[in-house]
Regions:
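Non-catalytic signal-transmission and effector/linker regions of two-component phosphorelay proteins
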Residues: 1-5
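Conserved sequence signature across two-component system core domains
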Residues: 7-8, 37, 57
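Two-component/phosphorelay signaling modules centered on CheY-like receiver
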Residues: 10-35, 77
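Conserved Asp/Asn-Gly motif in the active-site loop of CheY-like receiver
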Residues: 34-42
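Hydrophobic residues at beta-strand termini and immediately following loops
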Residues: 37, 106, 145
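CheY-like receiver
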Residues: 44-49, 53-128
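Conserved binding/recognition cores within well-folded domains
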Residues: 116-158
Length: 158
C-alpha cells in the first residue's frame, strides 16, 4: 500500500490531484491511502503525531504561512526515507526542490503522464527500501529501521 499526502492550500487542486492519483494507482492495482492537508503547518503537525505513516508527499510551494519548501526542509530533517514531490506553478524553485532531495517537480496543472512517472519512481523506491528496512510499529508511530543496523531481536513475553 502506498500512503500519500497532498499538501496544497487550494481545495480544488487537492481534489483534482487526489482523483488523478486514485485513477492511476487503480490502473496499476496498487492500494493507496491519501491524506489531505491545506497548509504546511497542518502537514507537519500531523506527521509529528503519525511518524512514518506517509510514504510520498505532494507539496505545493506557494502557500500562506509555512510554504511548501520550508515544510519540505522540516520533513527532510525528520526523515530521509520520505519521498517529496513539488507540484507548483512556479519554475523559480526547481533547484531548491532538488536541494531537499525531491523525487520530482511537477508543473501545475499536473498531467497524468507526469504523475504516472512520479508514481513509477516512488513505487520502485518503496520496493527497494522494503528490502533494506525492518518496519516496527509502536505507540509512537511506524519506524523504518535499517536492516544493516540490527544486531539481534529480543522479545519480552510476546
Amino acid at each position: 500500500m502506498l500512503r500519500i499526502g497532498i499538501c496544497d492550500d487550494s481545495a480544488e487542486a487537492r481534489l483534482g490531484l487526489r482523483a488523478m492519483l486514485e485513477r492511476l494507482l487503480d490502473k496499476r492495482a496498487v492500494e493507496c491511502q491519501i491524506y489531505e492537508f491545506s497548509s504546511g503547518e497542518g502537514l507537519l503537525g500531523w506527521m509529528e503525531k503519525h511518524t512514518g505513516e506517509i510514504d510520498l508527499v505532494f507539496l505545493d510551494i506557494e502557500m500562506g504561512g509555512l510554504n511548501g519548501m520550508e515544510a519540505a526542509k522540516a520533513l527532510r530533517e525528520r526523515s530521509d526515507a520520505l519521498q517529496l514531490v513539488f507540484v507548483t506553478g512556479y519554475t523559480d524553485f526547481v533547484f531548491d526542490g532538488y536541494a531537499v532531495g525531491a523525487l520530482g517537480y511537477v508543473m501545475k496543472p499536473p498531467q497524468p503522464e507526469q504523475i504516472g512517472d512520479v508514481l513509477t519512481r516512488a513505487l520502485a523506491a518503496q520496493f527497494n527500501e522494503a528490502d533494506k528496512v525492518f518496519l516496527c510499529r509502536n505507540t509512537d508511530g511506524l519506524f523504518r529501521i535499517p536492516k544493516k543496523s540490527i544486531r539481534y531481536f529480543y522479545s519480552d513475553r510476546r
